[in-house]
Amino acid sequence: MASDSLPFEILLLSPCLLPGQTYFKESKASVKVEPQAGETILFFNIDDQSNPGCNLRQFLWGTETGQKICDLIVFYAKESERIICFVELKDNISDLGHGTKQVINTYNTFKGHLQKSYTAKAFIYACTGALPYEHEEYQRKLLKEFGKNNFDFNNRSNDALGDLLRGIPPKTGAGKRKNKK
């Protein structure tokens, strides 16, 4: 079963791991999780365009080009719970469709290398913009792949990613509101 652990060997033993960091910023968008007592949270920058030292893309797809990969994998553990969250950051939520493809494609390829002893989640965050008309279609795709309460997008709460990891439902109206005037 050595091949089952290989993705985590790549993540842990390469520049993919962001040691001691629970904050990540790409362009204008960022995410942060404040660890609580008893939690282990690891951030992995897996996008080889922003982190050329991470070889996860080559492991998952070899020399095949054009595959969509998300920005981060966040590993969360507390007591016996293990969560692997696939995270994509966008400057504008109009890119929600592309972000949805990135997290789903990364998850579907990644899960083929692991035993299902974890909960998979997805988080897509954009710092600006109104939800695209097709957002319900993307929501259905995420629901199909990750299940109810295992994904969130455009939730602008400061602790939205931490809440998702901990299983705390989104605050009322978060991620659903229109631009205020």
Model-predicted regions and their roles:
Residues M1-P52:
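Charge-rich, low-complexity N-terminal segments
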Residues E79, D91, G129:
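Short, glycine/serine-rich, charged loops/turns that create anion-binding
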